[in-house]
């Protein structure tokens, strides 16, 4: 892949990551959300083959709007298939900086031992893996994907009381669903899905993540 194409891909991927962080409630500047390809090149370079940028240059650290101590890293490992050594380096950095959540944007995937280490570190450290291919477009901007809103515990309690339901009576959505993964929705959370409706203006459904 030539430099121009690779730079374009890296820009698109990082832009989706910025939108994802923003949509999860983390503080991202408007400049970060709106960064053009030219601005990306000015900041990071346009010659990936010469290490400008190296993937590690694209690392992101964001703090949550509601709680500045709730921070999240986004790592871009250099190696196409990520091994356990890299995961240990990331985990050490997270420990040093007292950060418990990170996203890892991988080119081709992870080795079985690296994948297992993510499972072993949860729930103390939450590391989520995304394939860069998944991030070339923002799935939530697709016209067929309805708006998803993660509900607070209070909103869920109110919803169940209003309809006299138990939580396990709600329809389900898988935690591995692409939109659920984008928002970082965990098992046991409830998501409100808002679809446009020709008759009612909008049609709302609720799903329990499993």
UniProtKB/Swiss-Prot annotation:
GO molecular function ontology, one term from the record:
DNA-directed RNA polymerase activity
Q: Where in the cell is it found?
A: Nucleus; Nucleus, Nucleolus
InterPro entries to which the protein is assigned, alphabetical = Arch_Rpo5/euc_Rpb5, RNA_pol_Rpb5_N, RNA_pol_Rpb5_N_sf, RNA_pol_subH/Rpb5_C, RNA_pol_subH/Rpb5_CS, RPB5-like_sf
Top-level division of the source organism's lineage: Eukaryota
Pfam families noted in UniProt: RNA_pol_Rpb5_C (PF01191), RNA_pol_Rpb5_N (PF03871)
Q: Which residues form the signal peptide?
A: none
Question: What's in the keyword line of the UniProt record?
Answer: Acetylation, DNA-directed RNA polymerase, Isopeptide bond, Nucleus, Transcription, Ubl conjugation
Family note: Belongs to the archaeal Rpo5/eukaryotic RPB5 RNA polymerase subunit family.
- NCBIfam families in alphabetical order: PRK09570.1
The protein's name in its UniProt record: DNA-directed RNA polymerases I, II, and III subunit RPABC1
User: What organism does this protein naturally occur in?
Assistant: Bos taurus (Bovine)
